[in-house]
Amino acid sequence: MKVLTTALLLVTLQCSHALSPTNCDASKPLAEKVLDLINKGRRSGYTFQLLRVSDAHLDRVETATIYYLVLDVVESDCWVLSTKAQDECLPAMRTSEVVIGQCKVIATRYSNESQDLSVNGYNCTMRSVSSAYINTKDSPVLVDSFEDSEPYRKLARKALDKYKAENGDFASFRVERAERVIRMRGGERTSYFIEFSVRNCSTQHFPRHPPVFGLCRVVLTYSTEASDLETPEYTDLICEVFNTEDLKNRSDMKPHRGHEHPHCDKHLCKLSGPRDHHHTHKTHEIGCPPPPEGKDNSDRPPLQEGALPQMLPGHSGPSGTNRSHRPPHNHSCNEHPCHGQHPHGHHPHGQHPHGHHPHGQHPHGHHPHGQHPHGHHPHGQHPHGHHPHGHHPHGDHPHGHHPHGHDFLDYGPCDPPSNSQELKGQYHRGHGPPHGHSRKRGPGKGLFPFHQRQIGYVYRLPPLNVGEVLTPPEANFPIFSLPNCNRPPQPEIRPFPQTASKSCPGKFEGKFPQVSNFFEHTPPK
C-alpha cells in the first residue's frame, strides 16, 4: 500500500509540474507567428488577427519548448487563399463585419529560429458579433449576419453570370460557395453584402500561370418593400483572382513575382457600365516553391506553410476531456516516411481499420454525406451517442456544429460542382470526395507546404446575441505526431491546461475594444 501511495504521489507531482504558466503579453510575439502559420495553412474563410493572448503555458522538454496557448482573434478582410501580405490585411473596418473567435493551440519550438516553430494542433470557434454589437433599440440600421450562407449562393451565381456576360475573360469562372452574408436594413433601403469564392473551370489552354480561383464581393441593394431578392435595384461586384503560382509563393524565403491577370493591371480596374459596377483585382506575393507534392488540409487549418509536424486526426473521449498520448514506441523516419503509407495501422486519410473513415473512401456503404446504412454515421451523431471504439474521427464538435465548409481544393479547378454533394456537408470540413469520385486532385494538387494531415479545425457558430459570450473551443488534438525527418522525435504532448496563468489574459488590442466583453476572460488587472 505504501509503495502504491508513493507511486501515485510521484505521478501527481510529475503532472502538477508538467506545464509552467507564463506571461501572456510576453508570449504575444510568438503567438503572432503561430497564428500566421495557422492562417497560411487554412483553405477557406478569412485570416485571423490576434486581439489578445488569453492564456499561455509552456513545457520544456530537452531542446524543445512546447507552448499551450489560448488566443483571442478577429477575422480580417483577407481571404485565406489571398496572396496579400499579412500587414496588408486589415481587421473589419465596420462593426457589421466583426467576427471574433478563440483558438486553443499547441505549438513547438526547437530553437529561437522562426523556421523551427511548428503547430501541433488547434481548435477555433468563431462567431459574428454584428447583431449583438449594433442592433440596439435606438439603432437606425439593423444588421443581420447569416451563419447559413448557402441560400444566398444563387444570388451570387446570378451576379457572377451577369458579369460574365459582359466580360468574356471571366466566362470560365463559377461560384464555389458563399463565404459571408450580411444584411443591412435602414431607411428606405435594404442591402445584402455577399462574399463568395470562385474558381476557374475551363479546360482550355491557358498561359503558364492562369488565374485559378478568387474571392468576389457583391452588394445587392433593394427598396425596403422588395420581396424578390433576384431583382436588385443596384449591383456592385468586385473580384480578386489568384493563380497557382501565387499559392506556391506564400512564404518569404525566395522572391518571385506573380503574374498579372491578362485584362487587369495590379490595381482595381473597372470592367462594366455605370449601373452594375464590376472590378477585378490582382494581387502579388513573393515566396518560395512548395515541398514535395502532397495533400492539403482543410480549415484546417489545416495548416499551410512552415515546418509543421505531420499529425494524425485527433481521437477524443467524451466532451471536455483531453486525450494526448505519447506514441507507443519510437517512430523513426525509416519506419514512417514523411510522405506515403503509414504502417502500424495508422491511416490518416486512406482506408481506416475497424470502421474509421474520417477521410477518403467509405467502404461497406459508408457515404461521406447524407444517410448512412446500418446505422453507421462516420461524421455525425452515432446511435446511442457512441462512437466506434470510443473515438470520434474528428474530435468533439461544440453544440453539434462541425467545421465550416469543405476544402476549397478538394476539387480540381475544372471539376464540375456536384449539386447533391458539394454543399450538403457545409459545416463539416474534411469530408472525403462524393461517393464514386476518386481522391485524385486536379491542377491544384500539392500547392501548399503545410503538412498533409489535418491538425486543426475552425467551427463557425451562430451569431452572438446581447449578453452572450463566445463559446470556448474544445482542446481535442491529434493523438500523436509522426516524425519530421529534419528534426528530432516529437516530444510528448500533455493535456491542455485547465487553469489559467496568473499573468493572463494579456492586453486587448483592437479597433473595437467593446468586443472584449464577448470573451469569457475579464480584462487584466
Curated annotation (Swiss-Prot):
Changes after translation: N-glycosylated.
CDD domains named among the record's database cross-references: CY (cd00042)
Residues passing through the membrane, by range: none
Disulfide bonding pattern of the chain: C24-C504, C78-C89, C103-C124, C201-C414, C216-C239
Glycosylation sites: N112, N123, N200, N322, N330
Domain Cystatin: 19-122, 135-240
Localization of this protein: Secreted
Tissue localization of expression: Expressed in liver, blood plasma, serum and in platelets. Also present in fibrin clots, wound fluid from acute wounds and chronic leg ulcers.
Coiled coil: none
Site positions (Cleavage): R439, K440
Gene Ontology MF annotations: cysteine-type endopeptidase inhibitor activity; heme binding; heparan sulfate proteoglycan binding; heparin binding; immunoglobulin binding; metal ion binding; serine-type endopeptidase inhibitor activity; signaling receptor binding
Subunit structure: Interacts with THBS1 (via the TSP type I repeats); the interaction blocks the antiangiogenic effect of THBS1 with CD36. Interacts with HPSE; the interaction is enhanced at acidic pH, partially inhibits binding of HPSE to cell surface receptors and modulates its enzymatic activity. Interacts (via the HRR domain) with TMP1; the interaction partially mediates the antiangiogenic properties of HRG. Interacts with kappa and lambda light chains of IgG molecules. Interacts with ATP5F1A; the interaction occurs on the surface of T-cells and alters their cell morphology in concert with CONA.
Function: Plasma glycoprotein that binds a number of ligands such as heme, heparin, heparan sulfate, thrombospondin, plasminogen, and divalent metal ions. Inhibits rosette formation. Acts as an adapter protein and implicated in regulating many processes such as immune complex and pathogen clearance, cell adhesion, angiogenesis, coagulation and fibrinolysis. Mediates clearance of necrotic cells through enhancing the phagocytosis of necrotic cells in a heparan sulfate-dependent pathway. This process can be regulated by the presence of certain HRG ligands such as heparin and zinc ions.
Protein's name in the database: Histidine-rich glycoprotein
Species of the source: Rattus norvegicus (Rat)
Gene designation: Hrg
